[in-house]
């Protein structure tokens, strides 16, 4: 189905505004100066196939990392295993994570009428994820195992319920636990806002209009 150029432009700007709003939620909710002041973070929207729809004006290099996470989700989880309210987390550069271990990525599916219509994702640089030195940036490390905890692509939320065991496992391996928790909660809130906004767009225009607009 083709849509009119004006509607295409309207939807494109709507998607960009959603990504920017996600970024505002993340920056304003975060605990660490790395995210609040340096804005070492990014937010993006993807269609159901994992193609990029929009990325907020943060750090373009992060886009590849978020694309990797969406790809890992689609590779390692069957369609019927992904539910509304699920949220995925990863930081391992070799398994769908960021550009390095301190970059933690979080992605959520967007459902409408029982089907996945999009994904929202964000990535943020955490001050510390363990490893042999504070800050988790030992440039002379000869192994990734010295850099910090490796998080494969796993569900951190299952149908809207936080998996506290996985969260505690991550926090136990990080210095300054309360700041890590605050930043992770900001990332979770960011995605929830993105999912809500995308659902609103689908409800307003209908999925038969929104899908071609992506």
Predicted feature locations:
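N-terminal leader/propeptide and maturation segments of large enzyme subunits in energy/redox metabolism
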Residues: 2-10, 150-214
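Gly/Pro-rich active-site capping loops and adjacent beta-alpha segments
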Residues: 116-173
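Short, basic/aromatic recognition patches
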Residues: 14-38, 74-78, 92-98
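Regulatory sensory and allosteric helical modules in signal-transduction proteins
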Residues: 48-55, 67-92
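A short, hydrophobic, proline-anchored segment that marks a local hinge/packing element in signaling
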Residues: 103-113, 121
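A short, polar/charged loop-to-alpha-helix boundary motif
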Residues: 60-73, 127-136
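Short, small/polar residue-rich loop motifs at catalytic or cofactor-binding pockets
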Residues: 37-41, 102-105
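Short hydrophobic alpha-helical segments used for membrane anchoring or interfacial signaling
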Residues: 43-47
């Amino acid at each position: 189905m083709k849509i009119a150029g004006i509607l295409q432009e309207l939807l494109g700007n709507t998607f960009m505004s959603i990504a920017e709003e996600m970024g505002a939620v993340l920056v304003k909710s975060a605990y660490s100066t790395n995210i609040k002041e340096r804005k070492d973070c990014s937010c993006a929207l993807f269609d159901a196939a994992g193609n990029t729809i929009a990325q907020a004006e943060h750090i373009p290099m992060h886009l590849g990392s978020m694309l990797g996470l969406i790809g890992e989700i689609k590779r390692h989880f069957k369609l019927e295993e992904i539910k509304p309210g699920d949220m995925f987390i990863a930081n391992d550069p070799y398994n769908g994570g960021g550009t390095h271990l301190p970059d933690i990525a979080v992605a959520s599916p967007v459902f409408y009428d029982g089907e996945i219509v999009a994904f929202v994702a964000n990535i943020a640089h955490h001050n510390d994820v363990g490893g042999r030195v504070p800050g988790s940036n030992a440039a002379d490390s000869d192994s990734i195992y010295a850099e910090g905890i490796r998080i494969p692509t796993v569900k951190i939320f299952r149908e809207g319920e936080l998996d506290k065991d996985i969260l505690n496992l991550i926090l136990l391996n990080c210095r300054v636990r309360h700041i890590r928790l605050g930043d992770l909660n900001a990332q979770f809130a960011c995605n929830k806002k993105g999912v809500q906004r995308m659902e609103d767009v689908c409800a307003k225009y209908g999925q038969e209009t929104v899908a071609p607009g992506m």
